[in-house]
Amino acid sequence: MSEDFEILYSDSKESGSQHSHHHSDGEHHSSHHHSDESHHSSHHHGSHRHSKQRKRRKRILIITLSIVACLLIAIGVGGAYGYKIAKREVADVKQQAYTLKADLKNVMAGLKAQDPVATETACDQLDVAIEDINKTFDKKIWKTAYKIPKFKGYIDSVKELLNLVQEASSDIARPTVAVLNDYPLSGLKVDDGFSITTINAYLSLLEDIEPKIDHIVTAMNQVNLPMGLNSMIADYSVQIASMTGSYDNLKEFLPLFKTFIGDGSDRTYLLAAQNSSEIRASGGFPGSIGTIRIRDGVLTIGNFSSVYKVLASYTPSAANITAEEKELFGSWMNGPRDACFDPDFERVAYIWALAYEQKNSEHVNGVVSLTPAIIQGMLEYIGNVTLSDGTELTSENATKVLQYDLYYKYLNANASATAGDYVDDLFAETAKATMSKLVSDFDVKKAGDYYKVFSDGAKNRTVMMWMEDEEEQEFVKNAGCSGGLNEDPENPETGVYFSISDPCKLGWFLDIDTEIGEPVVNDDGTRTYDVTATYSNVLSNADKVNAGNYILGSYGGTITGYIHIFAPAGGTISDIKTSNGGRMYTGTYLSLIHI
């Protein structure tokens, strides 16, 4: 079954991009095409370039030797003996440069191994290498050479590089050693949690050294060395830049992360495991909910329980459900577990927090939402998880297992009366087992990988956050993971959402495809876009026959629910058409036009 809805909306912006959202989890496939021909062409060109570089280095070396030889003659040392001394002086500088490079490499190796003793030893050796080169340039022959303009530039370049390497040692490596000594990474994990003090020590270190690294790397790449040593510059800068390679990816989320963990003071967050098989506009039904608690400076992830045991049965009056929300989302807003019919996750999370506080008498500082797609992404880096019934979840199958396989294993046409509760327990177990494995096997070297899972989820609304404090919530918005409706006219988006209203598990079989046509510029400068949203039920006859009512719902496999389409901020919706003859109604929610 497939239903199409065609709408035209006008965007008051003269220009801007529009995006559609498909809020259901599934598999994503991509392919890469590699051209062997271009690879070989590039390789041949590179070899030719290297040949030219060798010739150029040889010319520079001859020129350098000639200049030094002339200087020796000028100070009374001539002939073959003078040339021999000149050659030795140049060779000494080159050898000292290679020693410097090796010592810097040892510093980086020590840091990578998180070995403060090895790093400090390498820093000491690096300082000696720098001092040796400076002593060489203090010789009379090099001081005389410094008076020659061209040679002066070369010597200045070498000294500039030495200063930058010295900065790398004193301003980057040694401060890192101090933190490694004061806050060894072995102290990061405390029983089943994480030390906030240790985390904050390394976050502060990264914030301190990152701009210094940027400065050093930029300055190094502008240094022009003599004697064919320019190739070393790239090696130096790459080694130093590698110190914060993961941080470069993480820094857009760093303000949010620091806000989330705070200074170690007590905090409580809800961790909602949403199930997209019962799809909702804000992700999925929150089948199980756990906690993230910070107590006495230690962050721990608590057990997960069924949403029915965790949230109050009725939405607290403090939520102040509006008449507009009742009109849009019906009676579903009366139960906090169903608040996610509202596509505005900020509102949904607030209601969940109130409902948790009412039932558990514990204040909530924020809410984090996870879906099966995020669990699958995490398993790629923490390894497989095996459930108590023997089901193995991997980075290849978790989404399908959690949204399809488990239901057809236990809730098929021959399901027992208690099978539903058993499956709910397996979902709660999945969330807890995944979080426990993340904690027990946590590897700081994989921070960049963990970030990728989080950032990818933030982009497609499979991970969302809400913070009670309004200032802290701004960090969530800036990181792009608030899950709120887009009210920014400078970044217009079309929102397409669906919520299943019948108790069933048919979300796996729902396909949503949104197409946005080319813009038509109107006389007043606004633009009109033709938007087509296609909703398809891809339930096969075989799956229908094998499924029990818990999966199929009250209508034998027919998907029923709420469709909401939001115009971009500042835009309108007109000329609504439906392929099945159904009626669509327009209205306004959070200042956005919707149907």
Language model features with spans:
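N-terminal type II signal-anchor transmembrane helix
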Residues: 47-112, 158, 172-175, 202-238, ...
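Conserved small/polar residues in nucleotide/adenosyl-binding loops
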Residues: 593-595
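N-terminal, intrinsically disordered, polar/charged segments of Gram-positive cell-envelope systems
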Residues: 88-138, 163
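Beta-strand-rich interaction surfaces with strong enrichment in secreted/lumenal proteins
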Residues: 518, 586-591
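Short beta-strand and strand-turn-strand segments in soluble, beta-rich domains
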Residues: 579-585
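N-terminal targeting leaders characterized by basic, low-complexity, disordered sequences
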Residues: 1-50
